[in-house]
Amino acid sequence: MTPKYPEKITFAHLPTPLEEMQRLGKHLGGPRLFIKRDDQTGLAFGGNKTRKLEFLVAEAREQSAETLISGGAMQSNHCRQTAAAAARFGFECTLVLTGELPDKPSANLLLDELFGAKIVAVPDRKDRDRILQEIFDTAVAEGKKPYLVPYGGSSPTGALGYAFAMEELMRQKPYEGSEPSQGCPDWIIFGTSSGGTHAG
C-alpha cells in the first residue's frame, strides 16, 4: 500500500544542484565532498525553508486561512521566506520578530516589509511565544482565519519537505560509476536550529 502524503504547492526550483567541492576535498586529503545547493530553491533568494513552506502553505490553503503568522529573529531567513510565500499566494502576513526595530530596515527585514508583512518587534525573546499566541487569538476573535507557521517551518507537515529532499539526494547519485549500495554519502552535515531538517 502506497502511503498518502499531504498535498503540497510546488514553487521551489527543484532538484537543487549537488556540487562537488574538489579543491576542499583535495586540501583535506582526499574525501569526496559535495554540497547540496538549497540556497537555489528560488523563493526570495532561496533557502531551505522553501521546501517546508510548499507543504505548510498548502495546509494553510486547505484550512482556508487568510493570514500567515510566524516568528523568529529580526533577520530570520525563515520569516523572509514566509513573507514571500504569503505575498506570492495572496495571504496577509504577520511576523513577530525578536529585537529592536532599526531606524532603517535592511537585509531580510527590508525584504519582509517589501513583501507586505506586518512586523511586530518583541525586545525580549522570552515574550515572543506569548505575543505570537495573542496575535493568533485576536485574529480568531475578529473572525479571521489565521494559520500559525511554526518557527523555522518545523512541524510534522513542514518536515515532509526534507523527507522528500532525501529522496531527491539519493536520486542524484553523486558517486558516478559506483554500485547502488555505495552511492549514498557516508555523512550528511548541515546547520540546524528548529529541527525540521533533522526530522525530515
Task: List PLM regions with ranges.
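PLP-dependent amino-acid enzyme catalytic core
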Residues: 1-200
